[in-house]
Amino acid sequence: MTLRAALLLVSTALLAACVSTGHVDPMKTDKGRDAARDAYIELGIGYLKQGATERAKVPLKKALELDPSNADANAALALVFQTEMEPDLADQHYRKALSSGDDARILNNYGTFLYEQGRYKDAYARFQQAAEDNLYPERSRVFENLGLTALKMNDQALAKQHFDKALRLNRQQPLALLEMAQLSFDEKQYVPARDYYERFTKIAPQNARSLLLGARLATVFDDRDQAASLGLQLKRLYPGTPEYQQYQSEQ
């Protein structure tokens, strides 16, 4: 977003507030300040989506000057600091964003941040809070995140429960499908593992991990051509990966 477009966004919001309040300075009215705050937040998020975190800070700071406790502004600034690898500042703003009440979207983002920091128990607790919102449109992803966190906590049975719930909410969750395929394979439940794997391949591109799993499943079901084909893809696309090294060790 250019500076000209940014200024136009804010000025348009102020103009709309001015029109609705007559000739009163819009910044001296609650409606005008709210309009300016929302415009600054939108501008900051626009910069953030472009990867311009330094630019994003300026309008987000202005938004917080108008409304210090605003959840959206604090959550956006938390994402900025998370992107810039400033964990203490990110954590601070996530907490501020949630201080006025739980929001499933912010809780999920905060949980993701905590997961990235290796704080798995804290992340799990935040994801659990987010999952309590039955109307949150991305609830299936929250359960997927719960499953991933449970794996980090070495609780495979709990992880399967969460991945299963994620897939009940949305059958087309590639990561949940791949994880269920892997967990089923590890438990020697090869038929469901193959089912999950085939569902995964229909909706997502292959990666090193899925190619290795696919080759292993093909070997289990004595499909030598498929096993060889997937092995060649793994060699060609991911030659230096641990997955390819593991594949070689199994031949």
Listing of model-derived features with the role each one plays in the protein:
Residues 22-28, 202-251:
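Terminal, low-structured helical/coil segments at or just beyond the last alpha-helical repeat
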Residues 42, 76, 109-110, 143-145, ...:
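Canonical tetratricopeptide repeat
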Residues 73, 106-107, 142, 176, ...:
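TPR alpha-solenoid repeat register
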Residues 14-35:
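Bacterial Sec signal peptide processing site at the extreme N-terminus
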Residues 36, 70, 103-104, 137-139, ...:
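Residue-level recognition of tetratricopeptide repeat
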